[in-house]
Amino acid sequence: MISAVFGKRRSLSRTLTAGTICAALISGYATMASADDGQGATGEAIIHADDHPGNWMTYGRTYSEQRYSPLDQINRSNVGNLKLAWYLDLDTNRGQEGTPLVIDGVMYATTNWSMMKAVDAATGKLLWSYDPRVPGNIADKGCCDTVNRGAAYWNGKVYFGTFDGRLIALDAKTGKLVWSVNTIPPEAELGKQRSYTVDGAPRIAKGRVIIGNGGSEFGARGFVTAFDAETGKVDWRFFTAPNPKNEPDHTASDSVLMNKAYQTWSPTGAWTRQGGGGTVWDSIVYDPVADLVYLGVGNGSPWNYKYRSEGKGDNLFLGSIVALKPETGEYVWHFQETPMDQWDFTSVQQIMTLDLPINGETRHVIVHAPKNGFFYIIDAKTGEFISGKNYVYVNWASGLDPKTGRPIYNPDALYTLTGKEWYGIPGDLGGHNFAAMAFSPKTGLVYIPAQQVPFLYTNQVGGFTPHPDSWNLGLDMNKVGIPDSPEAKQAFVKDLKGWIVAWDPQKQAEAWRVDHKGPWNGGILATGGDLLFQGLANGEFHAYDATNGSDLFHFAADSGIIAPPVTYLANGKQYVAVEVGWGGIYPFFLGGLARTSGWTVNHSRIIAFSLDGKSGPLPKQNDQGFLPVKPPAQFDSKRTDNGYFQFQTYCAACHGDNAEGAGVLPDLRWSGSIRHEDAFYNVVGRGALTAYGMDRFDGNMNPTEIEDIRQFLIKRANETYQREVDARKNADGIPEQLP
């Protein structure tokens, strides 16, 4: 039961190996092979992906990452008849962000905790499963859930990253290990924290598997590495932040970092100890037209610009798109979208290429909707800024310089320089995050899963003091994120919004939008049937008219959806599939406030639809979550303030601001361990639940500080118990976190 609570179930399905089902697998492949043969998929096959429209061979279906499929068996006229064809329960009830690949009727899906599954795409039958056995204590090395966004396929092998930093190649037919490498170089200059995780999908370009990493919230120096797809040997590496001593790393990035980037940093800021950030945790794109690899580069480490770089310089290559040669990793060009970043405005969001008519000529461009709220059009071959316009409301900048694309800052938004709080829109979660956008060549529109989640930026008082195994942002963790007063919280809740924004890139203007109940919804798929598919945080899966946003179909998936759908052919029939499971930093940190998007209890699955689906409805499940347990009546009020400080420093990022959970991980107010000092210390201090992702913290806090947290939790349980009990009596379920 405890393992299920922490979203990592130890079950029979978790123990399946390639060997136990090899015979079934081989017979299954014999029946699934088709004329749409992609089993030998390499770069040429992916370049000509539209010759194999029934497959989904790479992360964005094509190298352009447009997430458009020409399939049109399912279209506007018949999508209302869509039915559930099959579902497959997963063994991790946490956030699922993966894009499944589908090659000749076989689906390859990565799930939370870096597991890989091969599934019969027509029936949902599990063919093989691979568990890389990521250690449970790695969970607290990442900011934003133990998610995995997908895999890559090349020449009969499937590749994926693991949360503990490995890159793994498996035989696609058998699921057997071909090779495994550690992507984090032990000898490199990476900062004191060296807190790295891998949750993004690798990309393959010219026989090289390219993967990045995350970790800037703790302390990391960003880089990507290209590995030989056949052998796993390192081909090249490119760092996205300078060496703190401006010395060579003996990598492809040495020249540009030493001669161009280093000069944009203070030589003595905290970045020299923390790594500087700039991790590439999502978007890596190969463009065969320009023959370039594009990197979307992340935020600074620490976030605080004054502490990080003494308030000096643009800090290359933070918040940038960087173009490299695929064979060598040699730098070609860069465009920095957010100089002087202090808002966590990453540029790792999906990079898309397309051919766009501009001023009477067709240009090959990058279109990009990063966190900072602006929609950029950039020349894909040269990095020249063409145009930019905000696709959501922003208050940190009044616009972009029309010639250079540099932001025109609101002086008040430079909170690390003013020393004053800043209520930023968008906040750190961005106007657009990891949820994939799509483009339809039929409508000419880009469809952005946009959102508004403000953030209260407050400087850390007394200078920057990093903590091991904790977020090191240079901000006051007791005040950031969510306002304290009831009135401010009411206003904050009203500011939580989510939409599909249909954006016309030629006009740099919104065409129309679809309003959602709140933010943190799933990615978008566009199809030749003039449809958009998207799952929502409230557990509904929708199909919309791509021309005007009309809602044409919806299905109750019972759990929030943050992953993007895919579509494919199996036995000549079109299917639409998506991974189901809500998670990530929004419900982790915002906790009770995240419930405004709609309450669901996680039951992670893959679900697939067809026009003649016969699976029937999903099994009914508990929709109220764990019932509150009446807490102990007594607590030491003298200890709760320090308990709050320790909780916000070490616990809130997973268990919710002010100790209110959103249903993904345990809500500690109702944990039985808070009733007993020894039991609580065994979990928090000694790591009794390390195998399930709850690491030990006796190296970070002493027993007195851990007990202070327990006293704080008892206080919060008493303050909120009756409200939570009453809420479960209401038809609307559990309310948002409000006094």
Curated annotation (Swiss-Prot):
GO terms for cellular component: outer membrane-bounded periplasmic space; plasma membrane. PROSITE patterns: BACTERIAL_PQQ_1, BACTERIAL_PQQ_2, CYTC. Keywords: Calcium, Cell membrane, Disulfide bond, Electron transport, Heme, Iron, Membrane, Metal-binding, Oxidoreductase, PQQ, Respiratory chain, Signal, Transport. Belongs to the bacterial PQQ dehydrogenase family. GO terms for molecular function: calcium ion binding; electron transfer activity; heme binding; oxidoreductase activity, acting on CH-OH group of donors. This is Alcohol dehydrogenase (quinone), dehydrogenase subunit. Pfam families: Cytochrome_CBB3 (PF13442), PQQ (PF01011), PQQ_2 (PF13360). It is found in: Cell membrane.
